[in-house]
């Protein structure tokens, strides 16, 4: 009697267990599908660069996909369905064009070729490089020019040309005039003559950022350009 009563329960348990197993296998199969990139041939560097923007790395269950039915029209679909379309087209990838915003509840995606994705990366990298170059190009640099009280006329002219070039290029220039080591001090007349020449040559190109520091041994000028090169362009 006991065996007979237990039999239906055992049968029911076996059926219930089998049903759970089927559901588990179904879930496991879906997880496996979503754990691998639909575009398996893409290089790891491409996947890393576009992480969060291509294939299974797109973290949305529902998306808008462009050109699914009509070119330029957005169609709502699931990520799983979109990835199935990608797998059906060799050498293609699902690319997230735009994130959700106040006008679109879901991200906008598009199916593009590997070639288009590579060009997209090249263009984005190129824009980043140009922006970095522009940032450094527009950054004001400080140039240093050293004079000696006993500098001859030709050397003064050469160094003053460097000062003018630096100012015209939009750089800050620090001019320092001092005695050479183990050289005899020069007269006040010579010092005044050199300082007057420096001030005359830079007139119209630069202005003092702070008052010059002048004493019996040295003189220091910190100049900024009157007109930067970028503002002239």
UniProtKB/Swiss-Prot annotation:
GO terms for cellular component: mitochondrial matrix; mitochondrion. InterPro entries: T_IF-3_C_sf, Translation_initiation_fac_3. One of its GO terms (biological process) is ribosome disassembly. The keyword Acyltransferase does not apply. Its main location: mitochondrion. May be involved in mitochondrial translation initiation. This is Probable translation initiation factor, mitochondrial. It comes from Schizosaccharomyces pombe (strain 972 / ATCC 24843). The lineage of its organism: Eukaryota, Fungi, Dikarya, Ascomycota, Taphrinomycotina.
